[in-house]
């Protein structure tokens, strides 16, 4: 037992964000290092460290707009805060533009901080407003640079998990970062078969592994699921010759589609907001250069342009929509520019009702079940097989080629927060087992 922990300790919530840049680092890696440091000092973890994905449409995010938090019991909160601040100062990628922040709360989590977290899932939160909430309701704030990370850091503390998932993230030693990750797709392909509660490890539609990032950051791979035991077992299936530094399991809102619970105001959609819009298709879909599909929805009299991009794998279905179809779409609002209006970038579509479409056609022969032939203009129709005749063309319903139901991007194009098909209708109440190996160190290189 280290010097920070005793039976009657202080409950300390720590939130961290914006420690990375597009050139490297990852806030989850800083969380891994911080958790190790706190554990060594005897801090008691109440739950898995948390990885909270926030509004994916904010323009200044680096990759997945994820903030990290953790709740520990310590006898010396000031010493614990110093450990966290030192870690943020040491590991943040400051020279490449990171603007990190660490937020601290003691005891219970104030309701304004919870409200801020919920808001940060759907819209852009002004930094100064977040700072005011932090200074009034939290016990500490540290930041460098612009301090943009304070919004996510507070949100990581305030987020309330209803549904949740887990992610096991493994980390590379420093000398290997920036090199190709030696992972074999055939190993990854078997994970979801062996552990059905895992998800989005392999894209069957495109035949690709999707557990590893492509950039120079410290993450080697991440496996998502609902049971810690499954993640640990799945990690054993990923063979690699590379020596890794270690791993940590995070509780997360990934795979919950939590950011799409907000209903977007169709009359005045806020740029960069996330949510859903319900309405009726009002224009025929148009396929533009690149294979992207555009259409409009009439939502209570407001017309909302929508875009489905080729990379999503949903364009074939989107192109089959027709005027009068009732749909619910979810996604993010792209701001208007000189060349285009505000557009909802579609992340999912649920077709609730299909319009019935008819065309005039030659009548069928009821005896032969065959389409009759025209005898000439104004002369009616005749069956060439049995000779039966009919005078008028008939109205015939056209098969639509699309069904009522849910349409999602292929796995490799889904955002971190997207709820995959296998998690539709599910809510996971994951219990924390502090005695389980939720954090492991293989080789720190120290």
UniProtKB/Swiss-Prot annotation:
Task: Indicate the enzyme's highest-level EC class.
Answer: ligase
What protein family does this chain belong to? Belongs to the TiaS family.
Q: Subcellular location, in the record's words?
A: Cytoplasm
Task: Please name the GO terms of the biological process aspect recorded for this protein, alphabetically.
Answer: tRNA wobble cytosine modification
Organism, by scientific name, is Cenarchaeum symbiosum (strain A)
- GO CC, alphabetical: cytoplasm
GO molecular function annotations of the record: ATP binding; ligase activity, forming carbon-nitrogen bonds
**Nucleus in keyword set:** no
Catalyzes what? cytidine(34) in tRNA(Ile2) + agmatine + ATP + H2O = 2-agmatinylcytidine(34) in tRNA(Ile2) + AMP + 2 phosphate + 2 H(+)
- Protein name, entry field: tRNA(Ile2) 2-agmatinylcytidine synthetase TiaS
| Keyword Oxidoreductase in record | no
The entry's function note states:
ATP-dependent agmatine transferase that catalyzes the formation of 2-agmatinylcytidine (agm2C) at the wobble position (C34) of tRNA(Ile2), converting the codon specificity from AUG to AUA.
């Amino acid at each position: 037992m280290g010097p920070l922990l005793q039976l009657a300790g202080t409950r300390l919530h720590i939130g961290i964000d914006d420690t990375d840049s597009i050139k490297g680092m990852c806030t989850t890696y800083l969380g891994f290092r911080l958790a190790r440091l706190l554990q060594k000092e005897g801090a008691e973890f109440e739950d898995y460290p948390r990885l909270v994905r926030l509004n994916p449409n904010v323009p200044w995010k680096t990759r997945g707009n994820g903030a990290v938090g953790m709740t520990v019991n310590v006898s010396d909160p000031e010493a614990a805060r110093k450990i966290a601040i030192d870690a943020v100062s040491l590991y943040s990628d400051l020279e490449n533009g990171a603007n990190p922040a660490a937020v601290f709360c003691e005891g219970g989590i104030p309701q304004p901080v919870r409200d801020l977290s919920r808001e940060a899932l759907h819209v852009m939160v002004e930094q100064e407003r977040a700072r005011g909430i932090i200074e009034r309701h939290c016990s500490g704030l540290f930041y460098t640079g612009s301090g943009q990370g304070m919004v996510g850091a507070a949100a990581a503390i305030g987020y309330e998990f209803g549904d949740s998932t887990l992610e096991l993230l493994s980390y590379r030693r420093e000398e290997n970062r920036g090199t190709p990750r030696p992972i074999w797709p055939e190993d990854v392909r078997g994970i979801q078969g062996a552990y059905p509660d895992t998800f989005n490890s392999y894209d069957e539609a495109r035949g690709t592994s999707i557990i590893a990032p492509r950039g120079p950051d410290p993450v080697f791979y991440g496996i998502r699921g609902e049971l810690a035991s499954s993640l640990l077992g799945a990690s054993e299936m990923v063979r690699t010759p590379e020596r890794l530094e270690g791993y940590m399991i995070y509780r997360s809102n990934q795979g919950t589609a939590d950011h799409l619970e907000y209903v977007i105001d169709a009359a005045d959609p806020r740029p960069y907001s996330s949510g859903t819009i319900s309405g009726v298709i009002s224009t025929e879909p148009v396929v533009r250069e690149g294979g992207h599909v555009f259409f409009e929805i009439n939502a209570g009299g407001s017309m909302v342009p929508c875009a489905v991009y080729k990379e999503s794998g949903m364009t074939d279905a989107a192109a089959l929509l027709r005027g009068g179809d009732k749909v619910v779409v979810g996604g993010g609002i792209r701001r208007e520019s000189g060349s285009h209006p505000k557009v909802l970038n579609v992340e999912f579509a649920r077709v609730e009702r299909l319009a019935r479409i008819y065309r005039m056609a030659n009548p069928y022969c009821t005896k032969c079940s065959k389409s009759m032939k025209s005898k000439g203009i104004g002369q009616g129709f005749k069956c060439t097989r049995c000779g039966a005749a009919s005078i008028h063309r008939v109205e015939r319903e056209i098969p639509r080629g699309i069904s009522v139901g849910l349409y999602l991007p292929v796995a490799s194009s889904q955002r971190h927060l997207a709820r995959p098909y296998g998690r539709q209708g599910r809510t996971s109440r994951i219990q924390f087992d502090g005695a389980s190996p939720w954090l492991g160190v293989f080789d720190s290189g120290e």
